[in-house]
């Protein structure tokens, strides 16, 4: 009989920063303020690092479809660890086969990852106005975290 004893030390476990509810509220409030300042009716989505929806806020007048597009942009930015704009540029550059990438649906500008010390905590996706304006709102929200 062979007996094996495994001991796991806490030093093997890594801690990673995560988004707390207070972070979500701060990001959403700052993003909303940016949108309202510019009179933009948008939907704001915040996801965790795995692309799972944590927050969805549709401002008055935002198009119904924006409630589908914003989370998709956020998901793409989180799981891809880069702005969704990068994927739009890849496709616009002629790499149409990238459209077959699994689980990437928000391939338009407006999804921005939330990065801290090189780690992705999640992402913000915004939809409802021009894509560069969506990204502006997302970045304004993330700036509230002071990362």
Predicted regions and their residues:
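Short, Lys/Arg-enriched N-terminal segments with co-localized hydrophobic residues
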Residues: 3-12
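Flexible, solvent-exposed loop/hinge segments and secondary-structure transition points
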Residues: 12-147
């Amino acid at each position: 009989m062979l007996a094996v004893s495994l001991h796991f030390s806490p030093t093997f476990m890594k801690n990673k920063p995560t988004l707390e509810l207070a972070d979500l509220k701060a990001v959403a409030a700052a993003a909303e303020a940016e949108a309202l300042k510019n009179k933009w009716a948008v939907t704001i989505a915040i996801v965790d690092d795995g692309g799972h929806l944590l927050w969805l806020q549709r401002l008055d007048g935002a198009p119904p479809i924006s409630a589908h597009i914003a989370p998709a942009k956020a998901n793409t930015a989180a799981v891809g660890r880069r702005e969704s704009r990068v994927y739009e540029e890849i496709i616009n550059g002629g790499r149409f086969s990238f459209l077959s990438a699994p689980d990437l649906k928000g391939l338009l500008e407006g999804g921005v990852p939330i990065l801290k010390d090189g780690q992705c905590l999640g992402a913000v996706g915004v939809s409802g106005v021009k894509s560069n304006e969506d990204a502006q709102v997302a970045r304004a929200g993330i700036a509230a975290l002071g990362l």
